[in-house]
Design a protein with these regions (language model features):
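N-terminal leader/targeting and assembly helices and adjacent pre-domain segments
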Residues: 1-218
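Acidic, glycine-rich two-metal-ion catalytic cores of nucleic acid-processing enzymes
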Residues: 206, 216-252
Length: 252
């Protein structure tokens, strides 16, 4: 391989790594915003039902008022109307609508679940857009390397869609993304219940919940933030590899 091609490939790898850094920063920003929303909801919960720094589990398990239910239902309706929820997101929301009327604690869990669903739905859209652009660009790049004519962008987008929606080890990227949310939701629900039983101060509970959602270092492998970042990078690498493979099979 000539120096030209070696240098060209090295530059491509360098640019790809820079993009990966940008992707991780954007995902982190989204989870940080999600956390701030969750924290505010927890603080509001304590203010509304405690009037002091502690709330008993008995108080938390009292039935919610019709007014509280109506407020949540209206908020959920606005999310559906303005966010273009996916099939997965609508299914999650249906479950929250079923459980929110049980008691105040379940209403809090449903509110947080709504924010999680919105975040994951937006991440799915973000992932799909980024991966599509990467796949199209790589198809064009491979056509240039192999000396073939560049096809239309529409054609490449169809190729990209098939790759992105394809499974890897019998699971698609979107399934992995929603599974990450399921793990996070279950962990938050469990911590909320245990925290209220123990009578934890809301600030302590908030700090413990933050460790599940977001962390300021990539060392925190248990956070949903970290898992989503790793998923994005691994999917980006998979897309690049699959486009190259298909290009070589077609033109090589």
């Amino acid at each position: 391989m000539s120096n030209y091609w070696v240098e060209r490939e090295a530059k491509h790898i360098e640019e790809m790594l820079k993009r990966h850094v940008n992707y991780e920063q954007e995902i982190h920003r989204r989870y940080l915003q999600l956390w701030k929303t969750i924290e505010a909801e927890i603080q509001q919960f304590y203010v509304a039902y405690a009037g002091k720094e502690k709330i008993s589990i008995d108080e938390a398990k009292r039935r919610v008022s019709k007014h509280d239910v109506q407020i949540f239902a209206e908020k959920a309706k606005r999310y559906v109307q303005t966010r273009d929820f996916s099939k997965e997101a609508n299914e999650q929301l249906r479950l929250y609508n079923l459980t929110m009327k049980v008691n105040r604690l379940e209403l809090l869990k449903s509110k947080i679940g709504l924010y999680l669903t919105d975040n994951t739905n937006q991440l799915q859209t973000y992932f799909t857009a980024i991966l599509t652009e990467e796949a199209v660009a790589e198809f064009v790049r491979q056509a240039g390397i192999l000396g073939e004519s560049v096809l239309s962008e529409e054609t490449y987008r169809l190729f990209a869609k098939a790759i992105i929606e394809g499974s890897f080890h019998n699971t698609t990227f979107s399934q992995r993304l929603w599974a990450n949310q399921d793990v996070l939701k279950a962990s938050i629900d469990r911590l909320l219940t245990v925290g209220l039983v123990a009578g934890k101060h809301p600030d302590i509970l908030a700090r413990e919940l933050r460790k599940l959602v977001v962390i300021d270092s990539l060392r925190g492998k248990e956070t949903a933030d970290y898992v989503a970042r790793r998923l994005m990078i691994s999917e980006s690498a998979r897309i690049q590899s699959e486009v190259q493979k298909q290009s070589y099979e077609k033109y090589g």
